[in-house]
Amino acid sequence: MRRLLSIIVSLVTAISFAQQPVELPLWPDGAPNSSGLTGEEQETRPHFVTNVTHPTLTVYHPEKPNGMAIIMCPGGGYRGLGMDGEGYDMAPWFCGQGITYMVLKYRMPNGH
């Protein structure tokens, strides 16, 4: 009985983690060729990010993967990154199709 309970807890934990997005730093030890930006990221309006100093890749794994994947690079008129409408909001649709979906939060040149 104890072993069965342990297996059930492990499966439930694995399933719950499989549906959570995973945020991976692109350069854990710091980005090469720094853009010169310092300070914290700024969210100037909901999910519109500027001053990206720590780029990341957020991965959404579908429940039933079909072997395909897409990397979304949100735009924002060269002022920042629209992380919702051009990024995170589309994850449920792609994952529903079995496609692994990734959102890239990338650096931009100084002042952007």
Q: What is each PLM-predicted segment?
A:
Residues 2-10:
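Sec-dependent signal peptide recognition
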Residues 13-15:
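N-terminal signal peptide c-region/cleavage motif recognized by signal peptidases
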Residues 19-68:
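N-terminal cap/lid segment of alpha/beta-hydrolase-fold proteins
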Residues 36-38, 81-84:
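Short, solvent-exposed loop/turn and secondary-structure capping segments
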Residues 67-76:
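Short beta-strand element of the alpha/beta-hydrolase
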Residues 76, 105-109:
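Short beta-to-alpha linker loops that shape the active-site pocket of alpha/beta-hydrolase fold enzymes
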Residues 83-103:
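Short amphipathic alpha-helix adjacent to the substrate-entry channel of hydrolases
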